[in-house]
C-alpha cells in the first residue's frame, strides 16, 4: 500500500524545515512563499543561526522551533519569537519537531550525519520525508529504508529527484541501469599534481550550482557524486554497478534511467534546487515553477564525459565503501566531514582530503549495521581517527 500524506484542516501541506538557514532551507522557504496557498510552515530548526530563525519564524508565524546547538539555546534574540512559539534546544528537540501532530512533511536539510536521527523520527512518525540530507542514507540506509512506505520518502537531491521521476509510471524491474550525472566540479580536466595546489577559494567556485560550503567542496573532490551513488543504491534498491556516473558539464540533464529496450528517460531542467524541493512538497501534483524556465533554443550543446577516478580519488573511495557496505560508508562520511572542515579552515590541502578518508577506511574493520547507537560509535571513532591522521600529516 502506498503512503498517504496528511494535510492540514485548510488543505495545505504543513511543513517542518530542519536546517532552515542553509542553502536548501532558505530555498525551501522561497518555495513556501510562492505557494503560501498550498504550504504552511509549522516548524523550523537551525544549528546556531538564531537571528535568521527568529526572522523566518516571525514571517511565517511558526508555532514551534528548535536550536540544535545548546550554546545558542539562550540567545537573547529568541525573546523576539512570536508570542506562543515553542522553543526546543538540542539535537533531540530537532527530532521532536518531526514528530509533531501539526507537521505533515519533514524536509531534512541538516548538513552531515546529524540528519540521520531526524530522518528516522520523520519516518516512524508517519510523515512524508523530503530528504535533502544524503548522509542519512549513506550512513543509515540499511536502517532507514525498511521503515519507508512506498511514496513516503521523496529525495530532494536534484539527481535522485530526477531518477525518481524517470521511474514514475515505469516498471523498475525493466530498468537496465541508472546514469547519474555529474557537473565534474570546478577542477574537471585537472591533473592530480595540479589538484595539490588548489585553494579554498578555487574549490568553492562551483561552475553551475549555488550550494553550501561543505557540499561545494564535496562536489570539487567528486565525493558528492560518490555519496550520491551510495544514496541511490539504497533509494532504488539496486547494486552499485547498476549506477553509472557520467559527467554532464552543463548540469541540465539531472540524471537518466536506461530501460531494457534501449529507451533512456532523461530528466532535464534549470540548475535550481527549488525545483526538486518543490516536487518533494507537491508530489503527486506539479505546481507552477519557482525557477526560470529552461529555453532549449538558448541552451547550446550538451556534453558527456567519463569521470576520472584516478585523479578524483574520493569517487573511487566511495565506490569501495559502497561495495563493502556495512559500516564502511559511515567511516567514509565521517572522515570526509572532518577532512573537508579542516580544508575549509586551512588545516590541510585539497588532496589531503582523500588521503585522510583512505587512511580511516584502511584502519576500519567493517561490521554489519545493527543500530543507530552502533553508527554513532563508528562515526565518533572515524572522526577521532581522521583528526589523528590530520595531526600526523601536519605535525
Name each model feature, range by range.
Residues 1-395:
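Catalytic, metal-anchored helix/loop core of enzyme active sites in primary metabolism
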Amino acid at each position: 500500500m502506498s503512503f498517504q500524506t496528511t494535510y492540514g484542516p485548510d488543505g495545505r501541506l504543513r511543513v517542518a524545515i530542519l536546517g532552515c538557514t542553509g542553502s536548501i532551507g532558505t530555498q525551501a522557504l522561497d518555495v513556501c512563499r510562492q505557494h503560501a496557498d498550498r504550504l504552511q510552515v509549522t516548524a523550523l530548526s537551525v544549528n546556531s543561526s538564531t537571528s535568521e530563525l527568529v526572522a523566518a519564524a516571525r514571517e511565517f508565524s511558526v508555532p514551534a522551533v528548535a536550536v540544535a546547538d545548546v550554546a545558542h539555546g539562550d540567545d537573547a534574540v529568541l525573546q523576539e519569537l512570536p508570542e506562543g512559539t515553542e522553543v526546543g534546544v538540542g539535537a533531540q528537540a530537532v527530532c521532536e519537531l518531526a514528530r509533531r501532530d501539526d507537521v505533515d512533511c519533514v524536509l531534512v536539510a541538516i548538513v552531515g550525519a546529524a540528519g540521520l536521527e531526524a530522518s528516522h523520527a520523520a519516518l516512524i512518525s508517519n510523515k512524508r520525508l523530503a530528504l535533502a540530507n544524503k548522509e542519512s542514507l549513506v550512513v543509515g540506509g540499511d536502517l532507514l529504508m525498511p521503515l519507508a512506505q512506498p511514496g513516503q520518502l521523496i529525495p530532494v537531491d536534484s539527481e535522485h529527484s530526477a531518477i525518481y521521476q524517470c521511474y514514475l509510471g515505469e516498471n523498475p524491474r525493466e530498468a537496465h541501469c541508472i546514469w547519474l550525472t555529474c557537473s565534474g566540479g570546478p577542477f574537471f580536466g585537472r591533473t592530480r599534481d595540479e589538484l595539490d595546489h588548489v585553494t579554498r577559494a578555487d574549490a568553492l567556485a562551483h561552475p553551475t550550482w549555488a550550494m553550501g560550503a561543505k557540499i561545494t567542496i564535496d562536489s570539487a573532490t567528486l565525493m558528492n557524486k560518490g555519496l550520491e551513488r551510495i544514496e541511490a543504491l539504497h533509494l532504488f534498491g539496486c547494486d552499485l554497478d547498476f549506477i553509472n556516473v557520467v559527467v554532464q558539464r552543463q548540469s541540465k540533464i539531472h540524471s537518466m534511467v536506461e530501460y531494457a529496450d534501449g529507451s533512456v528517460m532523461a530528466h532535464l531542467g534549470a540548475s535550481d534546487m527549488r525545483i526538486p524541493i518543490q516536487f518533494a512538497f507537491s508530489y503527486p501534483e506539479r505546481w507552477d515553477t519557482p525557477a526560470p524556465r529552461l529555453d532549449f533554443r538558448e541552451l547550446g550543446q550538451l556534453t558527456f564525459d567519463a569521470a576520472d577516478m584516478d585523479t578524483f580519488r574520493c569517487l573511487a573511495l566511495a565506490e569501495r565503501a559502497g561495495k563493502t557496505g556495512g559500516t564502511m560508508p559511515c567511516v567514509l562520511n565521517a572522515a570526509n566531514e572532518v577532512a573537508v572542515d579542516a580544508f575549509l579552515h586551512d588545516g590541510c590541502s585539497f588532496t589531503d582530503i582523500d588521503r585522510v578518508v583512505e587512511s580511516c577506511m584502511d584502519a576500519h574493520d567493517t561490521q554489519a549495521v545493527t543500530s543507530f547507537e552502533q553508527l554513532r560509535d563508528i562515526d565518533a571513532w572515524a572522526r577521532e581517527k581522521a583528526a589523528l591522521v590530520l595531526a600526523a600529516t601536519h605535525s
